[in-house]
Amino acid sequence: MSKEGLPNVSSVAGAGLVVGIVSATWNEKICNQLHAEAIRTAKDCGAKVIETRVIGALELPIVVQKLAQTCDAVVANGCVIKGGTPHFDYVCDSVTEGLTRIALDSGVPVGNGVLTTLNEEQAIDRAGFDGSTENKGAEATIAAMHTALVLRDLP
């Protein structure tokens, strides 16, 4: 996979930020790792964390919407692995559209840590395990927190 163009931002000054982190439990091993990495990243940056879990990716937007009412930034983590039906496309499109709409409607940044992969190997490679080439739980958290700070500084 290409990391070309990936910004070199590994931390932000998150003291004073409240970050909501919600993760699905479907594809549990992968989602547990994304969840743990998001929490670790937010806490390492000094943010207060409010965390919760949902069953699947389709449940993420409604909980993100609720968290956006009280948080400075919200991170949604999940893992949708393509199967043999078009259900994958419907879930991925619905979740992405929902998370984007919530961010735009609420003015609260939403980090999208929902993996949409063709197989479990691709998901593991992006979930921040030892040996993974990417850490999307951490990356989504940094992106959401950074955006919250940018918005805070704008007139």
Curated annotation (Swiss-Prot):
Q: Which UniProt keywords apply?
A: Riboflavin biosynthesis, Transferase
What catalytic activity does the UniProt entry give for this protein? (2S)-2-hydroxy-3-oxobutyl phosphate + 5-amino-6-(D-ribitylamino)uracil = 6,7-dimethyl-8-(1-D-ribityl)lumazine + phosphate + 2 H2O + H(+)
Enzyme Commission (EC) number: 2.5.1.78
Q: Which GO terms describe its biological process?
A: riboflavin biosynthetic process
Gene3D superfamilies given in the database record: Lumazine/riboflavin synthase
Which annotated residues bind 5-amino-6-(D-ribitylamino)uracil?
W26, A57, L58, E59, C79, V80, I81, N112
Q: GO CC: one term?
A: riboflavin synthase complex
UniProt entry tagged with the keyword Transferase:
yes
Q: Which positions in this protein are listed as binding (2S)-2-hydroxy-3-oxobutyl phosphate? A: G84, T85, R126
* Chain coiled-coil ranges: none
Which GO terms fall under molecular function for this chain's record?
6,7-dimethyl-8-ribityllumazine synthase activity
Q: In which pathway does it act?
A: Cofactor biosynthesis; riboflavin biosynthesis; riboflavin from 2-hydroxy-3-oxobutyl phosphate and 5-amino-6-(D-ribitylamino)uracil: step 1/2
Entry's transmembrane regions: none
The record's comment on protein family reads:
Belongs to the DMRL synthase family.
Cross-referenced HAMAP family: Lumazine_synth
From the Swiss-Prot or TrEMBL record, give the protein name.
Answer: 6,7-dimethyl-8-ribityllumazine synthase
The organism of origin for this protein: Corynebacterium diphtheriae (strain ATCC 700971 / NCTC 13129 / Biotype gravis)
